[in-house]
Swiss-Prot record:
The keyword Endoplasmic reticulum does not apply. Mg(2+) binds at D449, D451, D453. It comes from the Bacteria. GO terms for molecular function: DNA binding; DNA-directed RNA polymerase activity; magnesium ion binding; zinc ion binding. Its cofactor is Mg(2+); Zn(2+). This is DNA-directed RNA polymerase subunit beta'. InterPro entries: DNA-dir_RpoC_beta_prime, DNA-dir_RpoC_beta_prime_bact, RNA_pol_asu, RNA_pol_N, RNA_pol_Rpb1_1, RNA_pol_Rpb1_3, RNA_pol_Rpb1_3_sf, RNA_pol_Rpb1_4.
Length: 1201
């Protein structure tokens, strides 16, 4: 077998007739498949054993030679070679066609490659190929021209007139002759000459022809090979025929298509032998052409060939295309052995790195390991008896199983895998039942809940796979979210509620002001009912094992609550004692105001103090992030487990319930509604008098009701008891938000109708009172819209992720430093006056491009190429610096990837990024994964002429596909001062800008809102009106970097508006991929074709060579491609073909004789090679492992890694 990891590239091209014959093991002459009585393949048929190999291993067809000892013998009776039956998957056959046939891909594709080579229109080609017209192949000395079309009548007239003085033909034969006569060298030179003077359409056509001619010249393909003389027959096991239980056969569609070809071919041969009339022969040739077309790409021309029930048959092209095609179904995703799936249930007592595997499942998954161990222990004599023991489930196998799975991690995956945390490794523990147990804290990462979700289990087999699973994928390692570097394993629901309840403070609770000597005493008092969890007490600070207290504080009393004492036991000893949810307390120390001298009157002191807020979900997240920063992975995962256990325990103790009595209605609600009704009445009066338009009336009514709802909500919050269970649930962040509560106890407010327009009739009732029939009906629209939106959004978001992954899959960290001298100058991203993304967030984890100094003291804050940590970022912002130049993926010089310095910190680990990290895929997942959280709506914003601004998912798609945005802003092409804004015709406004050497005027539609006024100084490319800028226009007016910065800011605005944080670097990686191509305008003295789309690196390389040799370099202009287009324009044809438009990509690649250098991930997955990322990268593959010494017994627990 071919070693998959041993070849460097893959090449595709056209096959010559001789090449096809050389692949073949024999000619298929008959359309028969299998004899229905003997069930043996027919000789010379589509399943013939003589051509394709034996049906049974080591056995010829007639049974004369059986067993492996006759290996390689060809039977003298039936002619079948004695070998493995597996060869029926690889041996090909062929059909000698009685007449040449054109290949539909090259004739029918857009543009028609055959048409370009022959300089004929596809219409004319179709007429020739399908025998409607003659074409002159050799005009001789007649006035006819070569390639001139003649109708049947004209042909007869000219034949009588000139006799044999010219030759003309029809069908693929004539095409083949013309193609064979083409002199590529001469045609190419003629076209180059033509290009010098040609303009418009002629120039475009010449460039396209030249591209195809050059492709044929450089690839060594012969244009006449686009016409087939010999048709390859694919191996029979790939188009199988199987017997069903009723004695009938099920067969692949390809066999039907092949049978049609063979039948027609044989009939044509017979007609030719008989010397049939020309018209009959031509008809048969046309039918043969159509049969081959249907085999290669059914349905591409005319009506598709259908099978039973009018179903179009699946041809060779369909086998490759789409989600069910060969590429996406079998090559990019395969079903694997050693895997299983089951329903998940919660495992609250598991450790962070554990999962519960059902016994039966574990036994099946680890079967070979168990069998080996049974034999090794002498519990079974051989593998067979071990297998029988397992099938009988003998009692002794369970101990063995437990031994086998110890320290053998398994991978758990939940579909859809939206980001890399969708697959994590756990150490299995055996559990009874049939459900997988999952640790509650990893649910957020998987987006899993226990309402019937299922998960898949995979077993890593090799030692390397196990080591990678343990070191890189263990759930305890995946604490940070790759998209923003924040902890992803934050507690949720019950755990949040428990910790919130635990840290509550209550005035005058039982035992308030009691002084305790240590924690144990306080806990004892609590267990015996002398104090409550919420009681504020004093405890001797020296008894608390916290290393952050000063010596003076150790001799004082600490004012705290019993609950907070218990809460702080879960934190590391050297972490500050947390008494209040503030940044100061978390990061620096416990505030001094909580320490009092032992002589103080504690009760009076406590009574004078205000109550402190309990610890909500966000604070718990901050605590986890701080612990991670200071103590790293091991300590954090242990602390998380303690936090989880404590949360569950206390929320059980708290016994939160929701009763109808907890929903208290508001007294003032009635009068607020009355007031609103009056205001609406006044607005309607103004409208009736014609003082305002209907649109204005609508907007104002909506505003009134929204204000009424907000007022009710505000009063509700104030009237609520802090210990109300519903309030506690939403305040802690466990579940629900304040608007849910408003709907229960206040009013439901305004609803949208099916079109998304807000109905101006508000729902004034709440759920506590109940809705009227009309109100209920109005609210059903919103409910239904919510559900349909979610369903549509999921599909859209998934498709977006797929396109993003495809365009960035080959971006990998390739080197330590690319040595670039360029950088990106960044400042806080703003929308008007509001800061969308502050500067320190953008700086953290990046490398500085220039030395950063304090503007006043001139002291160095960070040197060039220093990593900017959180502390340095804060220092920079505190120094009043507003913009900083950093290293960025935009300006990185690395080919096919990014370097470590330009990328910066790996957000998923919080450390420097490693060479080999697949940052492209991480970026795509980070942008795609929150896609489902974005809204689908196009907001209708206020004002009469309110433009629809696209937001949410549609806006993200618009940006990444580089489409013309909705509500487009008008941009200026000159920089300078706005000298006048005047009203022109049709109430349009005319803005005039005076540049340094140019004056421009722009007509602005009446409805647009201006962003400038007279006297404003504008730069080139700046927007004059509100709305989104078209990036394609921006790239024309300004430079690439401005476009990159604009796209980055726009993406961040959409996500931040929805409260989703994404690291800048992910967007940078994606945007860089959209701008990696250049369109050649002037070719200079290089041999590049004009109008070619080239990779910037290849272009620069070609120009460098030109300059070194002293010739004229080419010039080009950067092009912004949408992600779909960029994916299809990639250098790798395997990656592009497996993405979309498979036949077009393959046609193009075959003619150009393309080489795929296998640089990206997809190409290598398709070929079954190790991906060139992570540990599959060259520098890691060359490492050799050696045994230093054997360990006697592994005593370390897994958490001590």
């Amino acid at each position: 077998m071919l070693d998959v990891n041993n070849f460097e590239y893959m090449k595709i091209g056209l096959a010559s007739p001789d090449k096809i014959r050389s692949w073949s093991h024999g000619e298929v002459k008959k359309p028969e498949t299998i004899n229905y009585r003997t069930l043996k393949p027919e000789r010379d048929g589509l399943f013939c054993e003589r051509i394709f190999g034996p049906m049974k291993d080591w056995e010829c067809s007639c049974g004369k030679y059986k067993r492996v000892r006759y290996k390689g013998v060809v039977c003298d009776r039936c002619g079948v070679e004695v070998t493995k039956s597996k060869v029926r998957r690889e041996r090909m056959g062929h059909i000698e066609l009685a007449a040449p046939v054109s290949h539909i891909w090259y004739f029918k594709g857009i543009p028609s490659r055959m048409g370009l080579v022959m300089d004929m229109s596809p219409r004319a080609l179709e007429e020739i190929i399908y025998f409607a017209s003659y074409v002159v192949t050799e005009p001789g000395d007649t006035p006819l021209e070569k390639k001139q079309l003649l109708s049947e009548r004209e042909y007869r007239v000219y034949r009588e007139k000139y006799g044999k003085g010219f030759s003309a033909g029809m069908g693929a034969e004539a095409i083949k002759k013309i193609l064979a006569d083409i002199d590529l060298e001469k045609e190419t030179n003629d076209l180059k000459e033509e290009l010098k003077s040609a303009q418009g359409q002629r120039r475009t056509r010449a460039i396209r022809r030249l591209e195809v001619m050059e492709a044929f010249r450089n690839s060594g393909n012969n244009p006449s090979w686009m016409v087939l003389d010999v048709l390859p027959v694919i191996p029979p096991e790939i188009r199988p025929m199987v017997q069903l239980e009723g004695g009938r056969f099920a067969t692949s569609d390809l066999n039907d298509l092949y049978r049609r070809v063979i039948n027609r071919n044989n009939r044509l041969k017979r007609l030719l032998d008989l010397g049939a009339p020309n018209i009959i022969v031509q008809n048969e040739k046309r039918m043969l052409q159509e049969a081959v077309d249907a085999l290669i790409d059914n349905g591409r021309r005319g009506r598709p060939v259908t099978g039973p029930g009018n179903r179009p048959l699946k041809s060779l092209s369909h086998m490759l295309k789409g989600k069910q095609g060969r590429f996406r179904q079998n090559l990019l995703g395969k079903r694997v052995d050693y895997s299983g799936r089951s329903v998940i249930v919660v495992g609250p007592n598991l450790k962070m790195y554990q999962c519960g595997l059902p016994k039966e499942m574990a036994l099946e998954l680890f079967k070979p390991f168990v069998m080996k161990e049974l034999v090794g222990r002498g519990l079974a004599h051989n593998i067979k008896s071990a297998k029988r023991k397992i099938e009988r489930m003998a009692p002794e196998i369970w101990d063995v199983l437990e031994e086998v799975i110890r320290e053998h991690p398994v991978l758990l995956n939940r579909a859809p895998t939206l980001h890399r945390l969708g697959i994590q490794a756990f150490e299995p523990t055996l559990v009874e039942g049939r459900a997988i147990r999952l640790h509650p804290l990893v649910c957020t990462a998987y987006n899993a809940d226990f309402d019937g979700d299922q998960m898949a289990v995979h077993v890593p087999l090799s030692a390397e796979a196990q080591a990678e699973a343990r070191i890189l994928m263990l759930a305890a390692q995946n604490i940070l979210n790759p998209k923003d570097g924040k902890p992803v394993v934050t507690p949720s629901q019950d755990m949040v509620l428990g910790n919130y309840y635990l840290t509550l403070e209550r005035e005058k609770a039982v035992g308030e002001g009691t002084i305790f000597k240590d924690i144990n005493e306080a806990q004892l008092a609590y267990q015996n009912g002398y104090v409550h969890l919420h009681s504020r007490i004093a405890v001797f600070a020296g008894s608390i094992p916290n290393e952050r207290f000063t010596d003076e504080q150790r001799n004082q009393l600490l004012i705290t609550t019993v609950g907070k004492l218990i809460f702080n036991t879960i934190l590391p000893k050297s972490f500050p004692y947390i008494n209040e949810p503030t940044k100061f307390n978390l990061e620096i120390e416990t505030p001094a105001k909580y320490f009092v001298d032992t002589t103080t009157d504690v009760r009076a002191h406590i009574a004078a103090q205000e109550l402190i807020d309990p610890f909500k979900k966000k604070i718990l997240g901050n605590i986890i992030a701080e612990v991670f920063k200071k103590f790293h992975i091991t300590e954090t995962s242990k602390m998380l487990d303690r936090m989880k256990d404590l949360g569950f325990k206390i929320s059980t103790k708290a016994g939160m319930t929701v009763g109808i009595a907890d929903i208290l209605t508001l007294e003032e609600k009635h009068e607020i509604l009355e007031k609103a009704h009056d205001t609406v009445e006044k607005i309607t009066k103004s409208f009736r008098r014609g003082l305002i338009t209907d649109d204005e009336r609508y907007e104002r009514v909506i505003a009134v009701w929204n204000a009424a709802k907000d007022e009710i909500q505000g009063k509700l919050i104030l009237s609520l008891d802090r210990l109300n269970p519903i309030f506690m649930m939403q305040d802690s962040g466990a579940r629900g938000n304040i608007s849910n509560f408003t709907q229960l106890a206040g009013m439901r407010g305004l609803m949208a109708d099916p079109s998304g327009r807000i109905v101006e009739l508000p729902i004034t009732s709440n759920f506590r009172e109940g809705l009227t029939v009309l109100e209920y009906f109005i609210s059903t629209h919103g409910a239904r819209k919510g559900l349909t939106d979610t369903a549509l959004k999921t599909a859209d978001s998934g498709y977006l992720t797929r396109r993003l992954v495809d365009v960035a899959q080959d971006v990998i960290i390739r080197e330590d430093d690319c040595g670039t001298d360029r950088g990106l100058t960044i400042k806080a991203i703003r929308e008007g006056t509001e800061i969308i993304e502050p500067l320190e967030e953008r700086l953290e984890g990046r490398y500085s491009r220039k030395t950063i100094r304090h503007p006043e003291t001139k002291e160095v804050i960070a040197r060039e190429n220093d990593l900017i940590t959180e502390a340095i970022a804060t220092q920079i912002v505190d120094a009043g610096i507003e913009e900083v130049t950093i290293r960025s993926a935009f300006t990185c010089n690395t080919k096919h990837g990014v370097c470590k310095k330009c990328y910066g910190k790996n957000l998923a680990t919080g450390t420097e990024v490693e060479v080999g990290e697949a940052v492209g895929i991480i970026a795509a997942q980070s942008i795609g994964e929150p896609g489902t959280q974005l809204t689908m709506r196009t907001f209708h914003t206020g004002g009469v002429a309110g433009d629809d601004i696209t937001q949410g998912l549609p806006r993200i798609q618009e940006i990444f596909e580089a489409r013309n945005p909705k509500g487009q802003a008008i941009i200026t092409e000159v920089g300078g001062e706005v000298v006048s804004i005047e009203e022109g015709r049709d109430r349009q406004q005319e803005i005039t800008i005076q540049g340094t050497d140019d004056r421009r005027s722009y007509n602005i539609p009446y409805t647009a809102r201006l962003r400038v006024e007279e006297g404003t100084i504008v730069e080139r490319g700046e927007a004059l009106t509100e709305g989104s800028v078209d990036p394609k226009a921006l790239i024309r007016v300004r430079d690439v970097l401005s476009v990159q910065e604009y796209l980055l800011a726009e993406v961040q605005k959409v996500y931040r508006m929805q409260g989703v944080e994404i690291g800048d670097k992910h967007v940078e990686v994606m945007v860089r991929q959209m701008l990696r191509k250049i369109r050649v305008m002037d070719t200079g003295d290089t041999n590049i074709l004009p109008g070619t789309l080239m990779d910037i690196h290849t272009f620069t390389e070609a120009n460098r060579e030109a300059i070194l040799s002293g010739s004229q370099p080419a010039t080009g202009r950067p092009v912004l491609l949408g992600i779909t287009k960029a994916s299809l324009e990639t250098d790798s044809f395997l990656s592009a073909a497996s993405f979309q438009e498979t036949t077009r990509v393959l046609t193009d690649a075959a003619i150009k004789g393309k080489r795929d250098e296998l640089l990206g991930l997809k190409e290598n997955v398709i070929l079954g090679k190790l991906v060139p990322a992570g540990t599959g990268i060259g520098r890691y593959r060359k490492l050799k492992s050696e045994v230093i010494k054997e360990t006697a017994e592994v005593t370390d627990e897994i958490t001590n890694i």
